[in-house]
Amino acid sequence: MAALTADRVSVRYPGQAQPALDGVSLNVGPGELAVALGPSGCGKTTLLNLFAGFQFPDSGSVRFGGVPVAGPGAERAVVFQQHALLPWLSALDNVAFGLRLRGVPRAERRELAGRALAQVDLAEAGARYPWQLSGGQKQRVGIARALAGRAGALLMDEPFGALDAFTREQMQELLLKVWAESGSSVFLITHDIEEALFLATELVLMSPGPGRIVKTLRPPFSRRWRAGDSARAIKSDPEFIALREQLLADVFAQRKQEAWA
């Protein structure tokens, strides 16, 4: 698997006093699950858009596997907060849709789509339509669609933000399972501190005005889940709680500085 790198990238939007990103560097190594945590306006969505090739930096560079990112590509799959499923297609056909656009033969794409649905525990739901699926199931289909293309990197834009707390935790555990099985690099953005700590092998805390990385951590908790600890046990662990409170204090300190700036 290849590394996803941003090297001293800066982005300024027209009419904004501060850059959305100011000299940000981040390396998402092969097989890593990197999470960008921060409040609205910190530049985390802009950073994801750069990795996806949806936009380009004003300065600095973005590469995947050492090759400059020149636009969207099948090797970098994006999972959005809203599922974006086509309502007239079944779950299986939604998963296979991107493969169809790439000219993959019908039998092969249906096999790949079926395998991807099985990876997200929806093997029996291929014939269902989006209106027959719960919110969590729709997001599973979105993840399966990314997996079916055998992308080397998954880019996830607050994928569980619209889900209830119970379903969100289920989806977090599913993501760790899929990540472990696929070996893909994952870059996920969130404003949820607990989610970031639980999922990340590398966590970067970002601050707004201008968007910068102000803290980097390597939490052990996703590795512990892979070793057999439950999500509930991990999230009630004193080490987890202490790190959560420290990050919360960091975010509040940023907000206080902004108020006095």
Swiss-Prot record:
Q: Which GO terms describe its molecular function?
A: ABC-type taurine transporter transporter activity; ATP binding; ATP hydrolysis activity
Q: Where does the protein principally reside? A: membrane
Domain of life of the native organism = Bacteria
Task: Give start and end of each ABC transporter domain.
Answer: 4-233
Q: Which reaction does it catalyse?
A: taurine(out) + ATP + H2O = taurine(in) + ADP + phosphate + H(+)
Keywords (alphabetical) are: ATP-binding, Cell inner membrane, Cell membrane, Membrane, Nucleotide-binding, Translocase, Transport
| A Pfam family | ABC_tran
Residue positions annotated to bind ATP are 38-45
**Which SMART domains does the record match to this protein?**
AAA
Its record classes its membrane topology as: Peripheral membrane protein
What the record says about family reads: Belongs to the ABC transporter superfamily. Taurine importer (TC 3.A.1.17.1) family.
Its function, per the record, reads: Part of the ABC transporter complex TauABC involved in taurine import. Responsible for energy coupling to the transport system.
Protein name per Swiss-Prot or TrEMBL? Taurine import ATP-binding protein TauB
Source species:
Chromobacterium violaceum (strain ATCC 12472 / DSM 30191 / JCM 1249 / CCUG 213 / NBRC 12614 / NCIMB 9131 / NCTC 9757 / MK)
